[in-house]
UniProtKB/Swiss-Prot annotation:
HAMAP family: Ribosomal_uL18_B (MF_01337_B)
Similarity comment: family membership: Belongs to the universal ribosomal protein uL18 family.
Xref: Gene3D superfamilies: 3.30.420.100
Species of provenance: Wolinella succinogenes (strain ATCC 29543 / DSM 1740 / CCUG 13145 / JCM 31913 / LMG 7466 / NCTC 11488 / FDC 602W)
Molecular function (Gene Ontology), one example: structural constituent of ribosome
Self-association and partners: Part of the 50S ribosomal subunit; part of the 5S rRNA/L5/L18/L25 subcomplex. Contacts the 5S and 23S rRNAs.
GO cellular component, one term: cytosolic large ribosomal subunit
Record-linked Pfam families: Ribosomal_L18p
The protein's name in its UniProt record: Large ribosomal subunit protein uL18
Length: 118
């Protein structure tokens, strides 16, 4: 029973991911911020889809921060600093199929608070 529920949950996330990725595209001036949420950590990277390059990234594991709302704010603050260092002020947010709720929403709100336009 649990396997069936998890398969359905993952399939729905994959559908959402494809639907969202079909509509957004990152450029050098306005890169795509892709967020990945594991069970323990949070990862984000700014991607220029035109050239396929990662412009900036942050790793919650390397920062010693986990995967909850308060730590997502700290990770986003660190990421915003690296984006500003690279001269990026505007981004396109790719929630990567995750619902815009909890950790994902907290990360996005913290990016906005730190001066990055979404």
């Amino acid at each position: 029973m649990l396997e069936k529920v998890l398969k359905r949950k993952n399939a729905l996330r994959a559908k959402r991911k494809l639907r969202v990725r079909g509509k957004i595209f990152g450029t050098a001036q306005k890169p795509r911020v892709s967020l990945f949420r594991s069970n323990r950590y949070l990862y984000a990277q700014a991607i220029n889809d035109e050239s396929g390059l990662t412009l900036a990234s942050v790793d919650g594991k390397k920062l010693g921060l986990g995967n909850n709302k308060e730590e997502a704010k700290k990770i986003a603050a660190s990421f915003a600093a690296s984006l500003q260092e690279a001269g990026i002020k505007e981004v396109v947010f790719d929630r990567n199929g995750y619902l815009y709720h909890g950790v994902v929403a907290s990360f996005a709100d913290s990016l906005r608070e730190n001066g990055i336009g979404l």
